């Protein structure tokens, strides 16, 4: 089972919005209570939060499918549905979020920093919120919007102070095991280390962290070997330590050649970086050279032969043996001094917790008018596509099983100018029109240039046909019953309906 996971693909489904409620108030002696349907609750968001208690993406490796809670539906008596609970996923500091195309969306640093990675759908309005002067009791409500569904990639970049770099089998894992309490896998063959190992080194009352990353080979910046899986873990390190096998017997390998090959790959990788990590150019960070395996016969003689050339790099040189535990204390104190100097020269400001909202996140567009565009559908004749965030949201929220809801949608589209735009684009009655995921045959409600009808198609006729007697009529009915007036003695145009008077 993997213990360290630094790259995962998540399949996210934010919570759907709850549906609005279509309800009419019912109460004794209140026959015309009016609409009282409540709104649906918003769906839950999926949020990434930086936590100091998490150091790997291991949990997401086993549970990549993540779904947030749905909003509750509205109910009668103006009861609104509860909002779906947000789902907060804790990630380690240094996590980079990429979209499905591999493009970086956000770099999560700073404890408590949050990012809304998938937005929940908005709840639908109930018929109480849809009532107006011309539509007194709508017999429909709006549906809740579906939550965002997307795939994102999480990549973890190590946040160590010192990064151990070197060719495979140079002794990096052995070094971190003797400097700290880390227990990496150690064996005498290349690429024993396949994932980074992190260790904490105590130097008196001070500490620094060190990362043992997978071995490097020529062409790593182009993806060879472990390639970018190695290189991204040294982007954030403050100090780079070249670990060199001083006892290598290969003809084309020596300490100087190894370091030059490593530096070439680092330079190539720096040119590919899209943004600065905050620690400056990777090629300008402090470096040290660690000649390992000095306990091997002839290793010291080989190091002596290369001493002058190694000094030309201008970096401190340390000779150690992880097997014999020689030179380790001197190395630890030297690394601590370099780390302290680098921290002082590059102070890291404590970033306050913030909420990051990526540009691609779906959100409701404000304003009274809907922006849209109409274009011909290239895949079919006499077909058109209408694109617009607000227009497409109207489609998602319409219950197409309810004729009154469809009429309400048609009114909204006409008032927004969609019909006029379709006329100008060359559409005729019967043309196929696609909005969002819905395709329908266009049945224009108005001729070109004619104003839209003011009375909405969703008007409830029942409330306009009032059959109750007026107070004056009830008064005259009472007088007629008592014989004060003749019940047939009415003015022209009046109709005597005893049942109505007495009702």
From Swiss-Prot:
Residue sites binding GTP per the record: 166-173, 191-195, 212-215, 292-295, 321-323
Record has Metal-binding as a keyword: yes
A Pfam family recorded for this sequence: DUF1967
Composition-biased stretches (Basic and acidic residues): 457-476
Location, primary (coarse class): cytoplasm
Stretches that traverse the bilayer: none
UniProt xrefs under InterPro entries: G_OBG, GTP-bd, GTP-bd_Obg/CgtA, GTP-bd_prot_GTP1/OBG_C_sf, GTP1-OBG_CS, GTP1_OBG_dom, GTP1_OBG_dom_sf, OBG_GTPase
Example GO BP: ribosome biogenesis
Positions of the Obg domain: 2-159
Cofactor(s) listed in the protein's UniProt record: Mg(2+)
Signal peptide: none
PANTHER family attached to this UniProt entry: DEVELOPMENTALLY REGULATED GTP-BINDING PROTEIN-RELATED, MITOCHONDRIAL RIBOSOME-ASSOCIATED GTPASE 2
Entry similarity comment: Belongs to the TRAFAC class OBG-HflX-like GTPase superfamily. OBG GTPase family.
HAMAP family: GTPase_Obg
Protein name, entry field: GTPase Obg
């Amino acid at each position: 089972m993997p213990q360290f996971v630094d790259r995962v693909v998540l399949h996210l489904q934010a919570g759907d919005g709850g549906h609005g409620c279509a309800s009419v108030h019912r109460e004794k002696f209140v026959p015309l209570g009016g609409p009282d349907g409540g709104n649906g609750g918003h769906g839950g968001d999926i949020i990434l939060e930086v936590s100091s208690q998490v150091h790997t993406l291991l949990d997401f490796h086993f549970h990549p499918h993540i779904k947030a809670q749905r909003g509750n539906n509205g109910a009668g008596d103006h009861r609104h549905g509860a909002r779906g609970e947000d789902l907060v996923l804790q990630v380690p500091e240094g996590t980079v979020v990429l979209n499905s195309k591999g493009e970086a969306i956000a770099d999560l640093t700073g404890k408590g920093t949050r990012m809304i990675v998938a937005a929940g759908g908005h709840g639908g309005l109930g018929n109480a919120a849809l009532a107006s002067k011309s539509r007194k009791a709508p017999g429909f409500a709006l549906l809740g919007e579906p939550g965002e569904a997307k795939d994102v990639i999480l990549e973890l970049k190590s946040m160590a102070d010192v990064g151990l770099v070197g060719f495979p089998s140079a002794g990096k894992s052995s070094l971190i095991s003797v400097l700290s309490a880390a227990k990496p896998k150690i064996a005498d063959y290349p690429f024993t280390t396949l994932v980074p190992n992190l260790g904490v080194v105590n130097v008196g009352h001070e500490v620094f962290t060190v990362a043992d990353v997978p071995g490097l080979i020529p062409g790593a910046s182009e993806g060879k070997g472990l390639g970018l899986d190695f290189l991204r873990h040294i982007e954030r390190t403050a100090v780079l330590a070249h670990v060199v096998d001083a006892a290598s017997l290969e003809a084309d390998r020596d300490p100087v050649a190894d370091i030059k090959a490593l530096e070439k790959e680092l330079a190539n990788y720096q040119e590919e970086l899209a943004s600065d990590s905050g620690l400056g150019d990777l090629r300008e960070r402090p470096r040290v050279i660690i000649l390992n395996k000095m306990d091997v016969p002839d290793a010291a003689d080989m190091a002596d032969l290369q001493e002058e050339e190694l000094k030309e790099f201008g970096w401190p040189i340390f000779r150690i043996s992880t097997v014999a535990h020689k030179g380790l204390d001197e190395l630890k104190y030297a690394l601590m001094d370099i780390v302290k100097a680098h921290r002082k020269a590059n102070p890291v400001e404590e970033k306050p917790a913030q909420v990051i909202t990526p540009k691609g996140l779906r959100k409701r567009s404000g304003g009274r008018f809907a922006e849209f565009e109409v274009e011909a559908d290239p895949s079919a004749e006499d077909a058109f596509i209408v694109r617009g965030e607000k227009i497409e949201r109207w489609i998602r929220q319409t219950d197409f099983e309810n004729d009154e809801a469809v009429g309400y949608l048609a009114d909204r589209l006409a008032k927004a100018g969609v019909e006029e735009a379709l006329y100008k684009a060359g559409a005729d009655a019967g043309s196929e029109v696609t909005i969002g995921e819905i395709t329908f045959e266009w049945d224009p409600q108005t001729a070109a240039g004619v104003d839209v009808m003011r009375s909405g198609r969703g008007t409830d006729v029942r409330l306009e046909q009032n059959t109750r007697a007026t107070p004056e009529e009830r008064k005259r009915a009472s007088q007629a019953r008592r014989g004060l007036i003749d019940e047939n003695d009415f003015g022209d145009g009046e109709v005597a309906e005893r049942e109505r008077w007495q009702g």
